[in-house]
Design a protein with these regions (language model features):
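Glycine-rich, flexible N-terminal cofactor/catalytic loop recognition
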Residues: 1-57
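Loop/turn-to-beta-strand initiation segments
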Residues: 1-2, 73-77, 153-154
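Short active-site oxyanion
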Residues: 23-29, 102-106, 154-155
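General beta-strand structural signal in soluble alpha/beta enzymes
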Residues: 32, 80, 105-110, 157, ...
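Conserved helicase motor
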Residues: 53-62, 134-138
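Short Gly/Thr/Asp-enriched flexible loops that form oxyanion-binding sites at enzyme active sites
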Residues: 86-101, 168, 172
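Class I SAM-dependent methyltransferase SAM-binding "motif I" and its flanking Rossmann-like core
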Residues: 92-151
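A contiguous loop/helix-start segment that scaffolds small-molecule binding in enzyme catalytic cores
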Residues: 154, 161-285
Length: 285
């Protein structure tokens, strides 16, 4: 059997009795970083010396078959550096391979940065989506945010402290300066901090430099029905500035939730015929 064990995200006191028992009984531990696993065993006073296997993003696919075969013979405890394996951490391919091989998979629930950030954010938690890390490159990041512009659910992201300020600036630019945001830093640790405000306010705050492990929680978009006429004007304005019609239609559709096809067809119909366009740019002979 494969056992997914949720480990503390900062406070060792959050290690559950079940996790401690599993660590003490484990003959095989699969860890994202074996050094972190050894540190956890020592910190919790576990004296057993299990076989340790490293499984990370770069070797999980190759290791999965070997670990599944081991799990046929003995319980295999799988750990990430912090939190639950498979959640923005290695483990998905292993669980998939185990399911395909009819090997049982169970989990020891526990600490989660995603759920903890949601709980303390002050934003709606009845429906949410976890988006992992925002893209590193600014253009890719803004594109990802545009795709989420009309997402009605609360959104949770992980972010590097080095990119926090620029990401918050992009959030303010793409999702709106007044969009409600919470930045959760060093959750469960000594210097835990939750900063709440608008995207613009938090972008200014982060510009001074922020350290630690970061979760960003963003309020979902309010349900506002887009006006097709206004959206069409936006498409035509983009086209007039040099954007291709197809690209302009796609961009406005992402931002408004309207149909790309309908916007494209409406813009085609609204543009003057080619002959009249040519007449404006070519003088009469």
């Amino acid at each position: 059997m494969i056992i997914l064990g949720a480990t503390p995200i900062g406070n060792l006191g959050d290690a559950s009795p079940r996790l401690r028992e599993a660590l003490a009984a484990a003959e095989v531990i699969v860890a994202e970083d074996t050094r972190t696993a050894i540190h956890l065993l020592r910190a919790l006073g576990v004296e057993s010396r299990p076989r340790l296997i490293a499984m990370h993003d770069h070797n999980e696919r190759e290791r999965a078959a070997e670990i599944v075969e081991l799990a046929r013979e003995t319980d295999v405890l799988v750990l990430s550096d912090a939190g639950m394996p498979t959640v923005s951490d290695p483990g998905f391919h292993l669980v998939d391979a185990a399911a395909a091989a009819d090997v049982q998979v169970t989990a020891i629930p526990g600490p989660s940065a995603v759920v903890t950030a949601l709980a303390v954010s002050g934003l709606a938690t009845d429906r949410f989506t976890f988006e992992g890390f925002l893209p590193r490159k600014p253009g890719d990041r803004r594109s990802s945010l545009r795709a989420l512009a009309t997402e009605p659910r609360t959104m949770v992201f992980f972010e590097s402290p080095n990119r926090l300020a620029s990401s918050l600036e992009d959030i303010a630019s793409v999702l709106g300066a007044d969009r409600r945001v919470a930045v959760c830093r060093e959750l469960t640790k000594l210097f835990e901090e939750v900063k709440r405000g608008t995207a613009a306010e938090l972008a200014e705050w982060a510009s001074g430099g922020v350290k630690g492990e970061i979760c960003i929680v963003i309020a979902g978009a309010e349900a506002v029905e887009a006006d097709p006429a206004t959206a069409l004007e936006q498409v035509l304005a983009l086209v007039a500035s040099g954007t291709r019609l197809k690209d302009a239609s796609n961009e406005v559709a992402e931002a408004t939730g309207l149909s790309k096809r309908d916007l494209y067809q409406a813009a085609l119909a609204a543009r003057p015929p080619k002959a009249s366009q040519d007449a404006r740019v070519r003088p009469a002979p």
